[in-house]
């Protein structure tokens, strides 16, 4: 089997999950500043601002029964370090935001396939999922 179609399918699933979380955050009053922001250390799925808080959101979209507990285990210490470095790079390019309180959130989205098609649901939204140590 050619891995490219599967990779494209997984990327599309991730994009749909990010779009779902983006909509959720906007409904909660957050202003989205960036989506899929890239730097040498990785990618920030979503960056949002509300009042005096800036959040960096890692979105994990999985099928039910995934090996990594719905994506939660995929945000281990190495991934957290990459996200922190990427956030520092983002702030260095946007110094006017550096005085805001920063938080790292993780959104877990479940992708369910059925005879009627595919649906997505927010399983958990972890505010302050990890901290800068």
From Swiss-Prot:
SUPFAM superfamilies, sorted: Restriction endonuclease-like (SSF52980)
HAMAP family the UniProt entry points to: UPF0102
UniProt record similarity statement: Belongs to the UPF0102 family.
Gene Ontology terms for molecular function: nucleic acid binding
Annotated S-S bridges: none
Origin species: Synechococcus sp. (strain JA-3-3Ab)
Domain of life: Bacteria
Pfam family, one: UPF0102
InterPro entries for this protein: Restrct_endonuc-II-like, tRNA_endonuc-like_dom_sf, UPF0102_YraN-like
Protein name: UPF0102 protein CYA_0680
């Amino acid at each position: 089997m050619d891995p490219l179609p599967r990779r494209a399918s997984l990327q599309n699933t991730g994009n749909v999950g990010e779009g779902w979380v983006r909509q959720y955050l906007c409904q909660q009053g957050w202003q989205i500043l960036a989506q899929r922001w890239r730097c040498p250390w990785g990618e920030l799925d979503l960056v949002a601002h509300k009042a005096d808080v800036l959040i960096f959101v890692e979105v994990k979209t999985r099928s039910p029964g995934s090996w990594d507990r719905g994506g939660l285990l995929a945000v281990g210490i190495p991934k957290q370090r990459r996200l922190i470095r990427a956030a520092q790079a983002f702030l260095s390019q946007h110094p006017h935001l550096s005085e805001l309180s920063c938080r790292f959130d993780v959104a877990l989205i479940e992708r369910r396939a059925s005879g009627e098609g595919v649906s997505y649901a927010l399983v958990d939204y972890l505010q302050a999922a990890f901290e800068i140590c």
